Regions:
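Non-catalytic, usually N-terminal nucleic-acid engagement modules in DNA/RNA processing proteins
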Residues: 1-65, 69, 76
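Short, internal active-site loops enriched in acidic
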Residues: 70-74, 140-141
């Protein structure tokens, strides 16, 4: 029997956003009117149930874990500007309600200072959950984790090998992630990074050399790597519930 590991941050946000409705209060002939934005929590519940029922049917998984990000984030301790670009974005009205409902009804899972991606990565690569695990997310960052994946939007299963997972990690170190507000190595976009990493054996050495070639230090490379890396079982202290910062290879 397989357990589905769900990126519930995405589920809660998508449901909360999709249930918002703007209403114009006034007659068509009125010069001015009042606009309000509302969301019905019952609509949220219906959509959440539909989403999880569809997941279970499509994946044939009966067991589900819904991972959520903690309010605190260890990456912000490394780099205070991490995800700072998101602070001014308005959150959907019922986001908190959706999180709480999923936590209560779909085996919510949260750990101090970790993001949902980290929780999925740790659970997928450890024996905390017995049997087969399937990572369910649309987030490309989780391609850093070896194992079986399911994209709920495309409704596709795909596998990631350990070698592919490691490559995807080093790739992310160089290109950075504008969405999460860390820059990687200057001048390294997708094409240049793929060419640079192609057919290389010691990818971490390649990454460090790229940073040095841009006038940066090995410490700069390590900082970007720690921001980019999705935690695996080897990156987590289970006893003390603390992330183990990546130190290079």
């Amino acid at each position: 029997m397989s357990t589905l590991l769900v990126d519930a941050d995405v589920v809660a946000y998508q449901v909360a956003f999709s249930t918002e409705e703007a209403i114009r209060w006034g007659k068509e002939e009125d010069e001015y009117a009042i606009w309000t934005l509302h969301s019905d929590e019952q609509d949220c519940v219906r959509k959440i149930k539909d989403y999880y029922n569809t997941l279970k049917q499509d994946t044939q998984c009966k067991e589900i874990v819904s991972a959520f990000s903690d309010k605190d984030n260890f990456r912000k301790e490394i780099y205070p500007d991490y995800k700072l670009n998101r602070t001014k974005s308005r959150k959907p009205l019922t986001l908190s309600f959706c999180r709480e409902y999923i936590m209560k009804n779909y085996n919510g899972f949260i750990r101090p200072r970790l993001e949902a991606d980290d929780i999925l990565g740790i659970l997928a690569t450890s024996d905390v959950i017995k049997g087969n695990k399937i990572i369910c997310s649309i987030d490309k960052d989780l391609n850093q984790i070896a194992g079986l994946h399911y994209n709920p939007t495309a409704k596709e299963f795909y596998g990631i090998t350990k070698k592919q997972a490691d490559y995807n990690f080093y790739y992310q170190c160089l290109v950075g992630d504008a969405t999460d507000n860390y820059k990687g190595a200057p001048t390294y976009g997708e094409v240049k990074t793929k060419k640079t990493l192609s057919n290389k054996k010691n990818l971490w050495k390649v990454v460090k050399d790229c940073f040095k070639g841009q006038g940066l230090s090995e410490e700069d490379a390590l900082t970007q790597a720690r921001l980019a890396r999705i935690l695996r079982n080897t990156d987590y202290d289970f006893k003390n519930k603390q992330p183990i910062l990546w130190s290079g290879e």
